[in-house]
């Protein structure tokens, strides 16, 4: 086996300082279905993958170390159908989400995309292939 044999990204874990607020964001704003909810982590089903949130700090397998406030740790990109980008934008605005970049065409990527942040300051991209 080599690392080149890896074929799937099954789950992504976001380390959270604002666990409850971030959980509510992915439930209420993003509308992701809850797959698992426990005392120290929560997972949402996003297509065939899981998006998991856990508190920052010591963990069973390792300790994530110090956090630099204001720095984005990750950018998540979620694909939607092309006709949904503008309605997603309107929904985000109606829920009070601050938009970093409104929907725009990015020809070199073959995308129409918009960008915003979650409560942990992670950059979220919604995009459609065009």
Q: Model segments located where?
A:
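Secondary-structure boundary/capping motif
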Residues: 20-23, 113
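Short glycine-/small-residue motifs
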Residues: 123-126
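Conserved active-site tyrosine of GNAT-family acetyltransferases
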Residues: 22-27, 92, 121
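Vicinal oxygen chelate
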Residues: 1-9, 33-80, 87-117, 129-130
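Short hydrophobic beta-strand elements that form part
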Residues: 13-14
């Amino acid at each position: 086996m080599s690392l080149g044999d890896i074929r799937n990204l099954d789950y992504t874990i976001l380390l959270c300082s604002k666990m409850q607020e971030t959980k509510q964001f992915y439930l209420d704003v993003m509308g992701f279905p809850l797959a698992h909810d426990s005392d120290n982590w929560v997972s949402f089903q996003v297509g065939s993958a899981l998006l998991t949130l856990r508190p920052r700090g010591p963990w069973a397998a390792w300790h994530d170390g110090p956090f630099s406030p204001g720095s984005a740790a990750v950018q998540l990109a979620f694909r939607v159908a092309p006709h949904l980008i503008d309605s997603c934008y309107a929904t985000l605005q109606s829920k009070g989400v601050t938009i970093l970049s409104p929907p725009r065409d990015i020809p070199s990527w073959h995308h129409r995309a918009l960008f915003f942040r979650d409560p942990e300051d992670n950059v979220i991209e919604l995009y459609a292939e065009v």
